[in-house]
Amino acid sequence: MKEEVKGIPVRVALRCRPLVPKEISEGCQMCLSFVPGETQVVVGTDKSFTYDFVFDPCTEQEEVFNKAVAPLIKGIFKGYNATVLAYGQTGSGKTYSMGGAYTAEQENEPTVGIIPRVIQLLFKEIDKKSDFEFTLKVSYLEIYNEEILDLLCPSREKAQINIREDPKEGIKIVGLTEKTVLVALDTVSCLEQGNNSRTVASTAMNSQSSRSHAIFTISIEQRKKSDKNCSFRSKLHLVDLAGSERQKKTKAEGDRLKEGININRGLLCLGNVISALGDDKKGSFVPYRDSKLTRLLQDSLGGNSHTLMIACVSPADSNLEETLSTLRYADRARKIKNKPIVNIDPHTAELNHLKQQVQQLQVLLLQAHGGTLPGSINAEPSENLQSLMEKNQSLVEENEKLSRCLSKAAGQTAQMLERIILTEQVNEKLNAKLEELRQHVACKLDLQKLVETLEDQELKENVEIICNLQQLITQLSDETVACTAAAIDTAVEEEAQVETSPETSRSSDAFTTQHALHQAQMSKEVVELNNALALKEALVRKMTQNDNQLQPIQFQYQDNIKNLELEVINLQKEKEELVRELQTAKKNVNQAKLSEHRHKLLQELEGQIADLKKKLNEQSKLLKLKESTERTVSKLNQEIWMMKNQRVQLMRQMKEDAEKFRQWKQKKDKEVIQLKERDRKRQYELLKLERNFQKQSSVLRRKTEEAAAANKRLKDALQKQREVTDKRKETQSHGKEGIAARVRNWLGNEIEVMVSTEEAKRHLNDLLEDRKILAQDVVQLKEKKESRENPPPKLRKCTFSLSEVHGQVLESEDCITKQIESLETEMELRSAQIADLQQKLLDAESEDRPKQCWENIATILEAKCALKYLIGELVSSKIHVTKLENSLRQSKASCADMQKMLFEEQNHFSEIETELQAELVRMEQQHQEKVLYLVSQLQESQMAEKQLEKSASEKEQQLVSTLQCQDEELEKMREVCEQNQQLLQENEIIKQKLILLQVASRQKHLPNDTLLSPDSSFEYIPPKPKPSRVKEKFLEQSMDIEDLKYCSEHSVNEHEDGDGDGDSDEGDDEEWKPTKLVKVSRKNIQGCSCKGWCGNKQCGCRKQKSDCGVDCSCDPTKCRNRQQGKDSLGTVEQTQDSEGSFKLEDPTEVTPGLSFFNPVCATPNSKILKEMCDMEQVLSKKTAPAPSPFDLPESKHGATEYQQNKPPGKKKKRALASNTSFFSGCSPIEEEAH
């Protein structure tokens, strides 16, 4: 009897998974926020939902199980049904939470799901309840394309599985496999078997997407050991639903599309059931029969069960719509009321009911008689919890130990796989050789017998030779078998070493991981095939052995059967004879005793016949059994052959996969080698990325503006809707006037809101796509930056050095960093716009809006007005669409024309480009010809320069020869000058003598006008003789060619300026004349005391070769040894008279060290200046030769100073002598007549 309890709501747990790498790479943001310490989640900014449990992305599996699922297990042992239901979008973590992909290797991992944890907790509780007997059965089914498939059926064929409803037991599934389990390991193996058989495929949103709804059911029956009539039955349904999906996001095609349609259909029916159960306003009808999923979950939703719904959601803002839908369905599920009851056995329930009636009657009876009710009626014996806990602990330890042993044995089995196969092959070869050896041995025995019987000696010798050869063959066979076994052991050891050696390098590629998993799966299949093959071979071997043993028995039985049949025939004949004799004996009374004897004999014969027939039947049965055994053996041999073929195919496939993996590895190595070429193109790619980024920026800017406009329109539409709502409330208060206008305004606003909402959705999708593209660009740029920071090893071994690579990285790293920052800024902007639009859509699409949409139309008149307005809008929109289609066709036609024109222009441009290419080639040819011509001209100019240099050298040689001639002439002129000086000295001596004689005789005086005539054109004063013994005590000064040119130019200017410029010229001469250091003697300190004009050596100052100064007592007006305004330094004055001639003063007044022919006393003529200019041009290219010993002292000294002060590389100049006489530029000297 079922005991009803008060209805309890379905408990809902919300679980949010973290962002997956794909969503992070697309730049998705969290659209859910969790309130700490509260079971509340907020969508967007202000839309919140509250559930029984809320688990954020950081929550572990153990916490989810302990808080939400573990309390349901305690109710199972009280007789209540329980259901755990995982609901949500595809890829939201339902299978992960439920443990639908559990394997034995994940036993102690923290990521184990709910189903394995439920199994462990169930058996722990069972171990604690030692006073109960438990019977557990498990079943596993899936609903694939609206068909129920049994996951525990080994054949995986479509069995006849039907759904039936029992009034007492609820929903039952007829034809479903139920396996009895005793320990947790058996239950886990059933779960793993079902998981391996479940339909899983890959989509664009989930690489391991469940394509079916799966239900794992554990049925528990418990009985008290002390009271067999007290029993409870309960069921635990663990449901892993397939996720709802959109074809646009999953990109499903073919079978995947069909599966997705059926999944969405079943979930739609489930949503309708949840809505019907959660809405109190609707009728009592719930559409359970719309799908098989809702039919199977009929007891879990609104029936006899404690139900927990785990709503799994994705936090990415790109899945906000699906997440919001899941949250709304979960919120509706909280309103569902279940009525769980304790499931008791019907007979036990009836018995308990009768006991309750008896107790009630006893209570009434005692109350009637004034008695009391004993208080120990409902007392129950206590349980020994301590012993149960100790037993549970020991079982847990034993379970862990067995698990470790199992894992170790599995590893050893995997390593011995190849050895087993090779050993079997060698075993087969050895068996074949063993048969051959047995034949050889039999032949050998026959030969030995033949040798014994033979008498001919030659035949005996031949037979002995054959025997020796047989022995040799046997020895060689044994050696071959030993070598083969050794080779097999060596190969297996090498393979084991290779398998057990640690991996030196791990590839992060998914292909490598997939290859390893595939190899492991195939190895597992081979192990299973080997196990099955070994069992069947052992069975065949045993049956063959039994057949071989039964073979002689069969022949014996056949003989016995024949003999028995003959005996039966004989005995039948004897029996017939005895029957006839008995019939005759009955007629004869005297033969009564004989007839009794015969009658006994007849009975004995009948007994023998019956025994023989019984033996005959038994032997016939044995023969039939042998025939069936032979058929079984042949069938097993065929299966063994097929399994061996399958194993060979698996091994071949494993080798092919290994070869493919090796080829893939080689391909990857080639790609690594090609990194050098790719690195050279990165600069171009960077420029291309910059251009694309600019284009994308412009496009994204435009889309941002469009999204902002759509957002504004949506906001305006919502504002208008609020205003219309307010106006409608006001008009309702005033009356029912203007119904048509009100309905028209309301429908217009609704349509505008819907259109704005759809536009906002479209812009939202565009923004999501834009952010995805931006995120991909950021990932690519970051990968490029990392690859530039860490160049591959192959690249470091290239021709260019690592420093050059680092330089290239530094050049483009700043640009890449700036691009990444700008893209991240754009992503943040897109995320803010997405969040804003999503919030607006959440406000516009409230949960109650579909209900409130048509509440404004309450009468037929309002409905007619609405239909009339909608029909009018439809007609106008159709007309507008027709106009747009016409304009579109025209635009397409014009576009086609433009494309045609564009094609023609492109052809024209291609022709022009061809012509320009030809022109470019022609211009290139002309350029090359000009270059060749210029090269030839350059060669000719080089030849001409060489010739000019040759002619210049020849001219230089001529000038050098001319200089030598001039040097020779100067030497001759020097000799003439010396002779002239000697003559002048003699003349001076004679004049002095003459003057002395005149003074002495006082007969003749020198005429003053002769000596002091200022108007004389030229007055000659004989030079003072220069004795060769006198040592020069004055510093020599030289004059270079530049000073000589300056003096000549200055003297020419004096000719042009006239006599009035003499003072200034005199001052200029003092500037360039070097200062002479004069050694003043003691005799000349007081000056001279001449009375005349100080014109001869009688003057002390002139004798000391110095000028008269202030200390002299001579008359300054008469003294000719004075210079006005000058120091006492000897100079050579240069004056010019009215006729343009020069006057040379007494050479004795010249500073010591200067010769008589110092060029400062005369101005060179124009011919000398011309020759000097020509020589200067020549000397600018060639260094002047060493000065001759006949050069003037001043010239030598000036050249020395110039050479010390000239810059490096400047050629030294020298003074050139004229080809004419030295005095060609001077006026002739007139001698004084005595």
Swiss-Prot record:
Composition bias type Polar residues, residue spans: 498-513
Binding site for ATP: G88, Q89, T90, G91, S92, G93, K94, T95
Spans annotated as CRD: 1086-1144
Every Kinesin motor domain range: 9-336
Sequence position, cross-link Glycyl lysine isopeptide (Lys-Gly) (interchain with G-Cter in SUMO2): K1196
MF GO annotations: ATP binding; DNA binding; iron-sulfur cluster binding; metal ion binding; microtubule binding; microtubule motor activity
Main location: nucleus
UniProt motif Nuclear localization signal: location: 793-798
InterPro entries xrefs: Kinesin-like_fam (IPR027640), Kinesin_motor_CS (IPR019821), Kinesin_motor_dom (IPR001752), Kinesin_motor_dom_sf (IPR036961), P-loop_NTPase (IPR027417), Tesmin/TSO1-like_CXC (IPR033467)
Positions carrying Phosphoserine: S394, S801, S951, S1001, S1013, S1017, S1028, S1128, S1188, S1227
Region called Globular, residue ranges: 1000-1234
Region described as Interaction with PRC1: spans on this chain: 663-1234
Tissue specificity note: Specifically expressed in testis.
UniProt keyword terms in alphabetical order: ATP-binding, Coiled coil, Cytoplasm, Cytoskeleton, DNA-binding, Iron, Iron-sulfur, Isopeptide bond, Metal-binding, Microtubule, Motor protein, Nucleotide-binding, Nucleus, Phosphoprotein, Ubl conjugation
UniProt xrefs under PROSITE patterns: KINESIN_MOTOR_1 (PS00411), KINESIN_MOTOR_2 (PS50067)
Chain segments carrying region Disordered: 494-513, 712-737, 1007-1030, 1052-1076, 1122-1143, 1183-1234
Cofactor: [2Fe-2S] cluster; [4Fe-4S] cluster
Comp. bias regions, Acidic residues: 1056-1071
Biological processes per GO annotation: microtubule-based movement; mitotic cytokinesis; mitotic spindle midzone assembly; mitotic spindle organization; spindle elongation
Coiled-coil boundaries: 350-999
Subcellular location: Nucleus matrix; Cytoplasm, Cytoskeleton
Cofactor note: Binds 1 [4Fe-4S] cluster. In the presence of oxygen, the [4Fe-4S] cluster may be converted to [2Fe-2S].
Biased composition (Basic and acidic residues): 713-737
Phosphothreonine: residues carrying this PTM: T799, T1183
Function: Iron-sulfur (Fe-S) cluster binding motor protein that has a role in chromosome segregation during mitosis. Translocates PRC1 to the plus ends of interdigitating spindle microtubules during the metaphase to anaphase transition, an essential step for the formation of an organized central spindle midzone and midbody and for successful cytokinesis. May play a role in mitotic chromosomal positioning and bipolar spindle stabilization.
Protein name per its UniProtKB record: Chromosome-associated kinesin KIF4B
Species, as recorded: Homo sapiens (Human)
Source species taxonomy: Eukaryota, Metazoa, Chordata, Craniata, Vertebrata
